[in-house]
């Protein structure tokens, strides 16, 4: 591994770095690259660009490769010399290239890079020892570049970043064609000489470069030899290393012993340590996304997915596509089988898509690449148009990235729709990622319609299976104009709710929404397929009815008008109004909310927020509406009791009790559960015939608060029984 630069009598020329170059170095180191390890990415990227260039030239002139057919990149750490060397067999540089590219012709950084791109410049040459090269000084105190172009002699460039660099003809080891970059590492950067660290950085940043990257390491192994051979070994050691890099010559030693066993059975052997050069290719996983999807097997996709994500399970679905035209990029997207446990954690990185530019890894946490609701998608996007040295700030402004994002979202939705045709797999997908789809409906107005087609819910007619809104619409009655839904905590709770009684009795299907995120979802999803979504827990529920039903409703309103007024007076500010219900069958009453207020379920969710905004709570927890069932015996008897004596204290007590019970059954919480409990206990006492005045010794007399109106005597008790 000769890395020394031979100084002959040749002329050494010294050049000053241009001031702009010094500024550029400062800009690169301080602005774009906070982590030092990217120097390796930049140098490998430069090597890859140089290899691209010679490969391109060889297409029209195969003789260009006479100086070296193999296109490769070698990495050679040398702990003794504290150097890290990268060798490529790319196009190399002439003396003029070396002087111009590495120091005397300034580039004004990113701006020039973007302008050159828009002007149609050869993208691979811009990266070649342009901006990225200087990142070598993050880890190196001195850099030596030895290069050989087919059209020129071999030259060496050297600089310790002190404002100047030298160039001279190099008469050291001929490199054929290409470039050798020798980094003399700073004392505190020797980690980049370690096998583990180099492998880690290459895997992270340059795993999918299109040329083999080989790591050369000097290692030791034990070798068994006889005493007689020990002396010979010393002399032959270097030759053997070259002839046999991978295998020790133990078999040869063994056969010698067998040959000599007749002469000297007691010949001794001993183990010595020999040094050898170990070669390991670091990027065996080739960029699968650059291949034709028709040529790739599911097993290959599976292997790539596991190497990309470190997942132990296979992926659920895959989408492999390329976009060409004004913009060119390829993408490979995977849906995992299960959601990660921290899918919605704030501190977690926002997405799992790795962004590459021409097979060079740029970043894996680009927020602009995919919307947050699709953050479970894993994969890679490889752009041909973005500049290699792009920063996060530039990505936010990039029009190219906006187009890429739009295409990714479109392809993800296509993938979900394809998956929906396979019921078994879609069920697994929906269990894991339904929250993401609903979040998408809340956030992504452009794709809301397509996302709504992917939703699945239990309904009053679907049994144990979930159904889509499209299937619901196909089953709607001719007279039905709306999609009816109810939100709540569980399927059992909403199925037995008072709100769905009449709707179900009339044969209309009700969608059961039982996840907290459904509340946010339906705030944005006002209609589906031209049918409005109507909550059965809010005021203004209109069911299709014939003339007879309308007439009956009008009669009920007139008959119970006085009771409604009385109940409103008793409940006062607790309710906004009391009305006759068209939604109840077996329940005496229920609490509904205003059309734009929160449902009981939403109120429960918001109260559970640790960082809730109490000012919002005030007006969104809208006044409640009490609806009473005119066909229920409790309500009818209460009407008769009120007609007889509207000042009857028992009527007041029963109205409050009905209201509080309706609050609970409608999914609300009580502001004062203790008062409600005491009211119930008194009813129990009445039912058991216990005298109100009998207070046990243990029972504190203050147990019944003053504000609860006392129930009347036995006469009222008998009336209570009538109600029962």
UniProtKB/Swiss-Prot annotation:
Keywords: Acetylation, ATP-binding, Cell membrane, Chaperone, Cytoplasm, Glycoprotein, Membrane, Methylation, Nucleotide-binding, Nucleus, Phosphoprotein, S-nitrosylation, Secreted, Stress response, Ubl conjugation. Signal peptide: none annotated. The modification Phosphothreonine is found at residues 297, 479. The modification S-nitrosocysteine is found at residue 590. The modification Phosphoserine is found at residues 226, 255, 261, 307, 445, 669, 718. Residues 2-527 are annotated as: Interaction with TP53. Monomer. Homodimer. Forms a complex with CDK6 and CDC37. Interacts with UNC45A; binding to UNC45A involves 2 UNC45A monomers per HSP90AB1 dimer. Interacts with CHORDC1. Interacts with DNAJC7. Interacts with FKBP4. May interact with NWD1. Interacts with SGTA. Interacts with HSF1 in an ATP-dependent manner. Interacts with MET; the interaction suppresses MET kinase activity. Interacts with ERBB2 in an ATP-dependent manner; the interaction suppresses ERBB2 kinase activity. Interacts with HIF1A, KEAP1 and RHOBTB2. Interacts with STUB1 and SMAD3. Interacts with XPO1 and AHSA1. Interacts with BIRC2. This is Heat shock protein HSP 90-beta. It comes from Mus musculus. The lineage of its organism: Eukaryota, Metazoa, Chordata, Craniata, Vertebrata.
